[in-house]
From Swiss-Prot:
Glycerol binds at residues 81-82, 133, 242-243. This is Glycerol kinase. Coiled coil: none annotated. Belongs to the FGGY kinase family.
Amino acid sequence: MTYLLAIDQGTTSSRAMLFREDLSVAAQAQQEVPQHFPASGWVEHDPEDIWATTLATCRAAMEKGGVTAREIAAIGISNQRETTVVWERASGKAIHRAIVWQDRRTADVCARLQADGHEPLIATRTGLIADPYFSGTKIAWILDAVPGARARAERGELLFGTVDCYLLWRLTGGAVHATDATNASRTLLFDIYAGAWDDDLLRLLRVPRAMLPRVRDCAAEFGTTLPDLLGGPIAVRGIAGDQQAATVGQACFAPGMMKSTYGTGCFALLNTGATAVASKNKLLTTIAYQLNGVRTYALEGSIFVAGSAVQWLRDGLHLIKTAHDSDDLAPLADATQAVYLVPAFVGLGAPYWNPRVRGALFGLTRNTGPAEFAQAALESVCYQTHDLWTAMRADWPDGVTQNAALRVDGGMAVSDWTMQRLADILNVTVDRPVIPETTALGAAYLAGLASGICPPPAEFAARWQLDRRFTPEMDEETRARKLTGWTRAVKGLLASED
């Protein structure tokens, strides 16, 4: 039997999943990745931790599955996007910790870009906005913060990569410095229409071109692993950023299809086909995937805090012991209390894009307790998704129909209570697939597609299987009241910054 090995390197953990030819799961392994918070709004990873946990989970998954390198047709990589690594070309050693996508240290730089009128250039080339979320300003920060780094980068001694690129470099022993179009599209440096690095943006953000990787299709020949890493050489044939990999794994190949992934954050992507829809509602225009040199575009809404709100209940407030406890508590909340959590722990993402505002709770009373906190945390994810859904329908009214279903995945998607509340708040059908690990599935499929062992997209889409469908049950009056309360809470928080 032939297998596919998927690497799913995320914000809080590294996971490896072994898939059979029919894309059923044979084995998996997962390890937590330590996070570092050196200052308020700063989030970092040690690149060595990323590498060590990735390699360890690949080996563990292969051992659990009883599979050797000879039986694996290809590796597919999905990764936390935007997270930035700069390393030495000669040694492979990172010159600074990886700056994570959640990190907000370059907020002032982005504010200056906006004030100086550069946002139209950024938007028309990249589909993005000037925000610390993206890689470009993170690269510039590292080059300025590490003594001598800028001069070394200009001499070609330093390389930049998102996590996929860094892992590919390590897997191939430094033989390949490459990424895919989806990851490139998240750097603030890539023209998503021309499909190339943009010299104007490189000059604007002061990033030397010599640092940048080559950009390839999502399903392509990326290189071969060193034989001693996994017991033999294995071809790497698929790469996509985690949210784009999930879009593929959810088989959202038709324009108008939408998926939303609920992990540390929440990321909703709407397939717009060959049309790159320019948002008028502060969404992002991005590359959904690129196959055979053809780009498919998407509208994306990025929410920085979803599952991490539940982590806050557990690790910050110590109200729960496990994430599942929030599911048990939320239904017990007092229905007469209107408690809202606006989880702007690292600012607000789409459609507000405010990196400076911080989180707040509204509607607390003397009777507010753990159940109300749990419900507010879970509902905050639903309300934020509603903000994205509303913006997407406004941006592309002809492409999104009211009866369109939302496909969901990620760790929070296993919560029946949250998914039912999501259907209620959005007033749309929410579909959860049989295989919840759609990010890894998408990476495996891309690798299999390039290997010739997976079917074309249309046939793969026909195999998508539904686990459970959640249909709206909330009455319109209750829904409207809840959404009005959320809108007031967000407006109150934004007003408090002024």
